[in-house]
């Protein structure tokens, strides 16, 4: 099977109707979609967003069947509170794994937390790794603005020492906007990527922009890349070097949502136009084989 890079979008707490972003993905033929359990409850009983308790078995089955019918790769983003270092973190992650299994998702994503160092994080995550593997799922660990390339190099070195981690079980979710905000690589997300050890497997992508001032989650090509897309081109080249195949999630719900279509279309153009020449003496590889022919 030819590996494909699937562009998709994500649920959004800003939507009054939680299914609106998914319906948008279906309508526009996206190849991936991420379910982010980001429910927030307010004083007075009102709430925004959703969590797994809002998705009964009937709805989960419908999501799974719809994804299969439309050839959409699902991923699940665990709640931001799902920190395995906290007492309630592992149960939240297990709940996300169960939801992911029920809808036929590929992986569950969570944030790296270095409060107890790489060994402490890996130890706390071990039961979730085992449970995910038994459920046929992978875990992706996402960089936050506070976590550095060195943190990921250390974390994956610790993971390699863990018997529970089989090949391909755990990888990194590279968040481009967070990499741009990280202090050691501020406003230089390409440097962030280049400082990741080759042994750190990138298996998932969150893509958004900022100006280095805040985690603003600007749609791709509406921030700095609107004027100069050299950084995006360099990012795509790094993906090619790593032989990346998987989802690329546009992690925002802009107004108008049409900006997502424009970003996906522009990415498609860059992937098609990228030079197929050699990189570091490597073989000649056509970019098109990395890209899902749909938007």
Identify the residue ranges that each predicted region occupies.
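Active-site acidic/histidine proton-transfer and metal-coordination neighborhood
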Residues: 68-70, 81-174
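N-terminal pre-domain/capping segments
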Residues: 1-101, 105, 167, 171, ...
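Histidine-acidic metal/acid-base catalytic patches
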Residues: 1-7, 15, 19-26, 98, ...
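Active-site-proximal loop/turn and secondary-structure-junction residues that shape catalytic pockets
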Residues: 11-15, 37-41, 78-82, 112-116, ...
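Catalytic-core regions built around general acid/base machinery
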Residues: 53-70, 95, 124-131, 158-161, ...
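Short, solvent-exposed loop/turn segments at secondary-structure boundaries
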Residues: 46-48, 85-89, 119-122, 183-186, ...
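A structural motif corresponding to the C-terminal end of an alpha-helix
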Residues: 28, 65-73, 102-104, 131-138, ...
């Amino acid at each position: 099977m030819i590996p494909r890079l699937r562009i998709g979008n994500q649920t959004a707490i800003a939507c009054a109707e939680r299914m609106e972003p998914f319906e948008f993905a279906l309508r526009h033929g996206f190849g991936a979609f991420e379910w982010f359990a980001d429910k927030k409850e307010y004083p007075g009983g009102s709430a925004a967003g959703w969590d797994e308790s809002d998705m009964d078995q009937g709805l989960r089955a419908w999501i799974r069947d719809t994804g299969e019918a439309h050839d959409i790769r699902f991923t699940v983003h665990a709640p931001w509170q799902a920190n395995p270092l906290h007492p309630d973190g592992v149960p939240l992650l297990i709940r996300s794994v169960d939801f992911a299994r029920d809808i036929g998702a590929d992986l569950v994503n969570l944030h790296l937390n270095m409060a107890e160092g790489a060994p402490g994080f890996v130890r706390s995550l071990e039961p979730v790794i085992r449970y995910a593997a038994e459920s046929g799922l992978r875990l992706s660990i996402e960089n936050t603005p506070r976590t550095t390339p060195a943190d990921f190099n250390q974390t994956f070195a610790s993971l390699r020492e863990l018997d529970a981690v089989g090949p391909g079980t755990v990888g990194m979710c590279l968040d481009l906007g967070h990499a741009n905000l990280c202090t050691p690589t501020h406003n230089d997300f390409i440097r962030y990527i280049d400082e990741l050890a080759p042994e750190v497997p990138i298996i998932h992508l969150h893509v958004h922009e900022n100006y280095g001032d805040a985690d603003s989650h600007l749609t791709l090509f509406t921030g700095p890349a609107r004027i100069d897309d050299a950084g995006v081109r360099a990012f795509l080249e790094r993906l090619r070097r790593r032989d990346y195949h998987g989802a690329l999630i546009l992690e925002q719900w802009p107004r108008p949502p049409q900006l997502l279509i424009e970003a996906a279309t522009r990415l498609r153009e860059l992937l098609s136009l990228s030079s197929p020449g050699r990189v570091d003496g490597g073989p000649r590889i056509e970019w098109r084989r990395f890209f899902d022919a749909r938007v």
